[in-house]
Amino acid sequence: MSFESKKPMRTWSHLAEMRKKPSEYDIVSRKLHYSTNNPDSPWELSPDSPMNLWYKQYRNASPLKHDNWDAFTDPDQLVYRTYNLMQDGQESYVQSLFDQFNEREHDQMVREGWEHTMARCYSPLRYLFHCLQMSSAYVQQMAPASTISNCCILQTADSLRWLTHTAYRTHELSLTYPDAGLGEHERELWEKEPGWQGLRELMEKQLTAFDWGEAFVSLNLVVKPMIVESIFKPLQQQAWENNDTLLPLLIDSQLKDAERHSRWSKALVKHALENPDNHAVIEGWIEKWRPLADRAAEAYLSMLSSDILPAQYLERSTSLRASILTV
């Protein structure tokens, strides 16, 4: 009996088609999803098992289609190592803000009544950020390429970062204003306060967008632009007007994350639109989710201040969304 001798495969042979030495990003990011190898049975279980049926319906049969999702590249080419280096610097900056402003007794100098606005309009944001975290994690799990999943998992970590900042700031304010209800009534506000109900409805419904493409579009092309333009930026403006100089700086750090999310979302849309059929699919999902997002923004802005004209912020959300869709 003789055995045919085969030439051993090179390291990272699955990247050979690139015809160049793979970068660190390529090595740790590309073609890592083995669940895409067999469309009839994504996972090594019965093809009719609940998990396989889920992936076949909500990933493989998604109307958002491309012949090679693995060709998508994160424009920032972040990996776990570089992400941690970058965010370690950001977290050091945020912690230094907390320390310095605490030493200056900043919270005692805000305009009277601002603490109640923060209790009502800021501290419940941690529920919204947790929704963003869960939604990003779902897209990460369902995405058809590991380069997409990597972007989503880092976005998930960013959402946890935002949530942590909000919880920390809430407790810090409660030490100066123990009677403002900070850290005590956020769940009740999230569930019952009229100004939060649009956001709660939006996110509870968005978390049931099981198709991976619809989940991505509704989250990154509808929800997140609305949060940037109709929550973060109005909060910054209101904070400045109420002598709160810490919150705008904190939000600036979070907006850096949001800008990165917009960059990779824009790159993924550009990649998806290599298939012309995807244009109508993406536009259809945006039109489905935009009314909910607009109503959520209007309710929140009306709660934040009676002097705010929601229309201008909705227009900015539309402009940000359009910039992501422009390829």
From Swiss-Prot:
The UniProt activity regulation field reads: Inhibited by Zn(2+) and Cu(2+).
Biological-process GO terms, alphabetical: toluene catabolic process
Q: Where is the signal peptide?
A: none
Q: Which InterPro entries match?
A: Ferritin-like_SF, MP_mOase_hydro, Phenol_Hydrox, RNR-like
Q: Which reaction does it catalyse?
A: toluene + NADH + O2 + H(+) = 4-methylphenol + NAD(+) + H2O
Q: What is its EC number?
A: 1.14.13.236
Pathway assigned in UniProt: Xenobiotic degradation; toluene degradation
Recorded hits in Pfam families, A to Z, give: Phenol_Hydrox
Give the residue spans that cross the bilayer: none
Q: Name the phenotypic consequences of knocking out this gene.
A: Cells lacking this gene show a complete loss of toluene-4-monooxygenase activity.
Query: What Gene Ontology molecular-function terms does this entry list?
Result: toluene 4-monooxygenase activity
Q: How does activity depend on pH?
A: Optimum pH is 6.8.
Q: Which UniProt keywords apply?
A: Aromatic hydrocarbons catabolism, Monooxygenase, NAD, Oxidoreductase
Task: Establish whether keyword Aminoacyl-tRNA synthetase is in the entry.
Answer: no
What is said about its interaction partners and assembly?
A: The alkene monooxygenase multicomponent enzyme system is composed of an electron transfer component and a monooxygenase component interacting with the effector protein TmoD. The electron transfer component is composed of a ferredoxin reductase (TmoF) and a ferredoxin (TmoC), and the monooxygenase component is formed by a heterohexamer (dimer of heterotrimers) of two alpha subunits (TmoA), two beta subunits (TmoE) and two gamma subunits (TmoB).
**In UniProt terms, what function does this protein have?**
Component of the toluene-4-monooxygenase multicomponent enzyme system which catalyzes the O2- and NADH-dependent hydroxylation of toluene to form p-cresol. Also able to convert benzene to phenol, catechol, and 1,2,3-trihydroxybenzene by successive hydroxylations.
Similarity comment text for this entry? Belongs to the TmoE/XamoE family.
Please state what the protein is called. Answer: Toluene-4-monooxygenase system, hydroxylase component subunit beta
Q: Which organism is it from?
A: Ectopseudomonas mendocina (Pseudomonas mendocina)
